[in-house]
Amino acid sequence: MSESSSKSSQPLASKQEKDGTEKRGRGRPRKQPPVSPGTALVGSQKEPSEVPTPKRPRGRPKGSKNKGAAKTRKATTAPGRKPRGRPKKLEKEEEEGISQESSEEEQ
C-alpha cells in the first residue's frame, strides 16, 4: 500500500514541473518583461532623449455614468438678471391657458 502511494506522488510531481515549463497555449500570451539596455544591441537601441507621448483614453471615462444629479443646480435667477431660454409655465398659468383656449373657441 505504501509503495503505491509513493508511486502516485512521483508522477504528480513530474506533472507539476512540466506545467511550469511547458506552455499550454490557451488565452492571451503573457507580456514579456522589458529587456535591460545592457543586453540589447547598440544598433537597435532607441534614443534616450525621445519621450513617447502617453496614450489618451478613448471614449467615455469609467466613472462618469451617474454624475448628472451632482452637477445639476437649481434654476434660481439672481435679481437683475434675465432668465435664459424658454420661460417655464407654472401650474396656475397652465390651467388659465387651458380655460382661455376653451372660452375662445366658444366665442
Swiss-Prot record:
Residues 15-24 have a biased composition (Basic and acidic residues). The modification N-acetylserine is found at S2. InterPro entries: AT_hook_DNA-bd_motif, HMGA, HMGI/Y_DNA-bd_CS. GO terms for molecular function: DNA binding; nuclear retinoic acid receptor binding; nuclear retinoid X receptor binding; peroxisome proliferator activated receptor binding; transcription coactivator activity; transcription coregulator binding. It is found in: Nucleus; Chromosome. The modification Phosphothreonine is found at T39, T53. Residues 53-77 are annotated as: Interaction with HIPK2. The modification Phosphoserine is found at S9, S36, S44, S49, S99, S102, S103. The modification N6-acetyllysine is found at K7, K15. SMART domains: AT_hook. The keyword DNA-binding applies. Transmembrane segments: none annotated. Residues 21-31, 53-63, 78-89 bind DNA. This is High mobility group protein HMG-I/HMG-Y. The lineage of its organism: Eukaryota, Metazoa, Chordata, Craniata, Vertebrata.
